[in-house]
Amino acid sequence: APPRFNADATLGRIDIAPTEIDTSPRVDIGVVADIKVALGQLIAACDGKITPATYQSWRDRLAGTNASKVAEQEKVLANDATPIHPLRLCKEVGDFLDRDAVLVVDGQEILNYGRQSIPTFTPRHRINSGCFGTMGVGLPFGVGAKIAKPDNQVLVLHGDGSFGLNAMEMDTCVRHGVPITVVISLNGGWTADPDGDKPGRDLGYKRYDLMAEAFGCHAEYVESPDDIRPALERAAEANAAGKPALVNVVADHTARATTTAFTRYTT
């Protein structure tokens, strides 16, 4: 993989704690300061020295790369193939969500795909599981979000692996009357693996919908892209009646989330 920074770049670190300055692997310029004050001073120092034309060629190159990535993504978003591509699932979820919905995304591939394709329009209405190590928090986050905002639509988009870590909280939703919708990107194993040689890759398409149904949830199993939206609408009807819902969507196990259009990323 290429380095994240140009080897010739000068790297600076601003930290309010003097003891933290040299904890980074490499620091060329260390500044002990309040970051807000220091950045204000840097902006003032750069005034008139940097204009939009300064980095125009770089911006043009990025814009061209972004345009090609947008075109690639658009093809996948409209893909009707089965098993369903995770980006197609994300498109259906994004189109379905209310503008003020609370969206929780948790998993590996689906977390990255969700960041690339599902916008959020209201501050503090999107919750992610974060970078590595926190997988499984999606469903509990969704429960908390619905309790905090009972009048808002709350949807949790899970990978099947991350869902399994706290799947029993569907029972919590039923017992305590927390009507959220959980959508599972069911790719049948841990992470995408086009070569099929990773341990834990082929665990099968499990019927988490039947488990949720046994708890008392509204639950559906979806295998066709055209059936996603109707299933989401029925889940919303169940939520309106006070019932939690789970939509288990069979997803392409070979789809690996790579960097796509820069301008479409959200956190």
What do these predicted ranges mean?
Residues 26-39, 167-186, 258-260:
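A short alpha/beta connector and helix-capping loop motif
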Residues 1-61, 232-235:
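Glycine-rich, acidic loop regions that bind phosphate or pyrophosphate groups
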Residues 1-2, 210, 225-267:
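Glycine/aspartate-rich loop-and-adjacent alpha/beta segment that forms the canonical ThDP
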